[in-house]
Each structure stands twice: as structure tokens, then as C-alpha cells.
């Protein structure tokens, strides 16, 4: 990207309006330009025919619409798409589209790698490099919308839902994520309703409080354990923000909208968090919480110490929660044949921590000493 030019994908509508006014342009031009970029999907200013030649020339000199580069695209047997996107810095992130009969969900990344270290997630083993810019986040939506349209020659609105559940912890990139979600919900851009944009967090309490004040999007919490002792192992940020704080906030998160509920995500790990006593503990934990629970069959990745719970175990767990009035569903595994399922996204990360090197060392050890059983704790790879 030309360092002298501003990338317009970093601007929401109001910011774009202010930018054009600073360039001595009429405010109404912002709406036209915003729609060209996001609704029509045009990057070439020369093709924005209702802007006027003088403005088009000015935009060509001062601005650009720079996107991540698609370096690979895979399509699963079930129709799931996964794109590997190269950033200007050389790192790569992944974006996934999951088609269903009446909806299409785009799973969007927020960081290069992840700043957290959940023990059951492949992204965490890649380490962390940096936060994504607003342009790199909304650029995933822009690219997916164009790719899906171009592939079958239609211009139907295929992306009906966006989930901030890709690589990274969204709330540790608060400003850029909120800015991108605002563009997603803008009627001049992608026009998604607040109930169709979901942010998933591991429980960064201060930023959850901020999000509640400034954004109406749906909230999902990566819970995965019903006690602090177990969650400390699976989701280490729990040591800083324990369940008592997390559940207290979730109880009042949608207090002004009593019909809305917090979704609690719970990965099913064989013999770890899937036993009847865990279900009983979860029922007690979520008492009086406006909640729905999403059970996620574990999706394996190299060197993981975990296994997926059996279908019978998952069904029994779900049924027990349902009998106690907790709305519970089991997420259908999609895209696992191309490593696009929940917890499998990895990308290509130039790790600025030592986490990926430690993980690779452990992987090498497991290959060279098959006689030694390798047990990995979250502390060892933090």
C-alpha cells in the first residue's frame, strides 16, 4: 500500500464523511462513496460514475481501498469455504463461510494468532503477532461477499450472519473490532441486524462492560467449564477474570432487553468436562442467567491431548441441561475436512511470543520418542 494514501476500508460512514469534508467535498458524497465500496464492491474510483471526475481524481491521489490477498481457497465436502488471506506484513489469517439452507454465516478473524492460550484451540498454538486493523477485519467480509457472488454469477445476499469467532480474542482488539462491526450493521454497507452479528469472547470482563455500553451485537462467551479449577486449565484468562465475575456480568448484560440471551459455548472434551457431574455444575452455575448453551464437539489438531466426547455423551449432557430449562443445542461440525471447524483455524503467524516454538518443540519430541507419553499442561505452553 502507498504509505501516503489512506485506506478507506478503515473508515465507517461518519468518519468517511469527516474525511471528505476535510478534503473540501460535500458531505453527501460520503454516502455515495461508502455504498460504492461496500454495497457495490467497487475498488476502482474511475468506475464510481456518480462522484464526478474531479473527486474521482482526488480519490485516486489521496486514497486507496486495500484488501488482504487471497492466497488459497478450500471448499469442504459440506460446502464450507475457507480462505487463507495474506496481509501486507506477510502474516496470514483465515476466514470461513458456512452455508446453510436459510442462512450463510461468515466466521471472521480479529488478530494474527491469538493473545490468549486456550488449551483446546489450534489458533492458540500459533502464538500471537498483532491486532488486525479495521480494514483487515471488514476486508474479510468484503472479499467473502465478492468471492461468493463471483463463484456462481449471482448477486444474492449470501452472508446473512457474521460471527467474530475466527482467529484471536476480539475484545483485545476492541476499537478496530467495534468499528468493523458498525460497518457490518450499517444500512449503507452490509445492513446486518444487531442479532446477526455475534462477538465471541473468552471473558475479558472490562472490555465486555465497554462493549455492553457501545455495541448492540449478540454476545457469545467461551465458557467450556463449570468450575474455576477446570476453567483455569482450559481457558487460562479465567485466573484473571474468574467465573463469579463473568457470570455476574452475563446476568445483567441484556437487562434492558429481557428477551435476549447470552450464548455460552462449551467444547465437549472426552473425560475432561463432559461427565454428568459437570452438567450438574453447569446447571447450578447458569441458574437465573438468561442463557442458551451451544455444545461444540471437539475438533482435533496435531499433538492435542484432547479427544472428542462420544455422541451418546454429548446427547446425554444436552438432555440433562434441557430438562432443567436451559435451551441447549449441539453445534453441527462443519468444514473439519479442511481444518475450518471451530478451534481448528491456524493461518500463518510470525509469532512474537515463544508459544509456537514451544509447541513445535513438544511436537518434535513426540515424534522422536514414541515410547514416552506426552502430557501438556496449559502452564507449559503459556
UniProtKB/Swiss-Prot annotation:
Family of this protein: Belongs to the radical SAM superfamily. RlmN family.
Gene that encodes it: rlmN
EC number(s) on file: 2.1.1.192
InterPro entries attached to this UniProt entry: Aldolase_TIM, Methyltransferase_A, RlmN_N, RNA_MTrfase_RlmN, rRNA_lsu_MTrfase_RlmN/Cfr, rSAM
Domain Radical SAM core: 100-336
Protein's organism: Legionella pneumophila (strain Lens)
Keyword line: 4Fe-4S, Cytoplasm, Disulfide bond, Iron, Iron-sulfur, Metal-binding, Methyltransferase, rRNA processing, S-adenosyl-L-methionine, Transferase, tRNA processing
Note from the entry: Reaction proceeds by a ping-pong mechanism involving intermediate methylation of a conserved cysteine residue.
SS bond list: 107-342
Active-site residues (renumbered): 94 (proton acceptor), 342 (s-methylcysteine intermediate)
Residues passing through the membrane, by range: none
Gene Ontology biological-process entries: rRNA base methylation; tRNA methylation
GO MF terms held by the record: 4 iron, 4 sulfur cluster binding; metal ion binding; rRNA (adenine(2503)-C2-)-methyltransferase activity; rRNA binding; tRNA (adenine(37)-C2)-methyltransferase activity; tRNA binding
Superkingdom field: Bacteria
Catalysed reactions, as listed in the record: adenosine(2503) in 23S rRNA + 2 reduced [2Fe-2S]-[ferredoxin] + 2 S-adenosyl-L-methionine = 2-methyladenosine(2503) in 23S rRNA + 5'-deoxyadenosine + L-methionine + 2 oxidized [2Fe-2S]-[ferredoxin] + S-adenosyl-L-homocysteine; adenosine(37) in tRNA + 2 reduced [2Fe-2S]-[ferredoxin] + 2 S-adenosyl-L-methionine = 2-methyladenosine(37) in tRNA + 5'-deoxyadenosine + L-methionine + 2 oxidized [2Fe-2S]-[ferredoxin] + S-adenosyl-L-homocysteine
Positions annotated to bind S-adenosyl-L-methionine: 168-169, 200, 222-224, 299
Locations listed in the record: Cytoplasm
Described function: Specifically methylates position 2 of adenine 2503 in 23S rRNA and position 2 of adenine 37 in tRNAs. m2A2503 modification seems to play a crucial role in the proofreading step occurring at the peptidyl transferase center and thus would serve to optimize ribosomal fidelity.
Keyword check for Protein transport: no
Cross-referenced CDD domains: Radical_SAM (cd01335)
Co-factor: note: Binds 1 [4Fe-4S] cluster. The cluster is coordinated with 3 cysteines and an exchangeable S-adenosyl-L-methionine.
UniProt name for this protein: Dual-specificity RNA methyltransferase RlmN
Top EC class of this enzyme: transferase
Keyword Ribonucleoprotein listed: no
PANTHER family: 23S RRNA METHYLTRANSFERASE (PTHR30544), RADICAL SAM CORE DOMAIN-CONTAINING PROTEIN (PTHR30544:SF5)
Amino acids binding [4Fe-4S] cluster: 114, 118, 121
Cofactor(s) this protein requires: [4Fe-4S] cluster
NCBIfam families given in the database record: rRNA_mod_RlmN (TIGR00048)
